[in-house]
Amino acid sequence: MKKILLLLLLPIFGFGQVVNTFPWTNDFESFITLQEDPNDNGDWMLKQGPTSSANTGPSGDHTTGNGMYYYVESSYPGYPNQVFTTYTPMFDVSATPGKVLSFWYHMYGTAMGDLEIAIISGGTYTPIDTISGNQGNQWYFAYYPITAVDSFKIAFKATTGSSFT
């Protein structure tokens, strides 16, 4: 049995350089991953298809239903209150008007934890939202205008809930 905290990111990703060509999108079909925090409790993982535990996670990804999605596994030892953080590459958006972060997420399980989304710019970590608890068995679209920064990366910090269900 496991509880899943899921995320399908659309307008981001790739590593090794500063991204300055937009829109920048990824549906994880090319197995492009994000940068994992080496000091937290574990890594986000790629998954295809349904989760193996009843009443947790989606039946498939948002885009095709058969594609890949990024998620946190919270079966033992992934609970309680374990932190999993992943980062996008640095984005240089100084010449880009109308900066926006958008993605699809799925948080289904009775003991679901939290997903914190933050901007890191100039060494400052600024949370922009926290989504908490069981959101039901469906995908949701998140949309955040990004203001007052020209260079940044995004942190996705998942904190597992009180159990794996």
What are these language model-derived features?
Residues 1-22:
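Bacterial Sec-dependent N-terminal signal peptides
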Residues 18-77:
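Extracellular glycan-recognition surfaces and repeat-rich motifs
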Residues 15, 64, 161-165:
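Short, intrinsically disordered, charge-balanced linker/junction segments flanking boundaries
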Residues 110, 124-165:
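Terminal, low-complexity interaction segments
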Residues 114-122:
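Short, surface-exposed beta-strand/strand-loop-strand elements in extracellular ectodomains
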Residues 71-84, 132-136:
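Extracellular beta-rich ligand/substrate-recognition surface
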Residues 61, 107-109:
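Extracellular acidic, Ser/Thr/Pro-rich low-complexity tracts
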Residues 28, 86-107, 115, 150-160:
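Extracellular beta-strand-rich recognition modules
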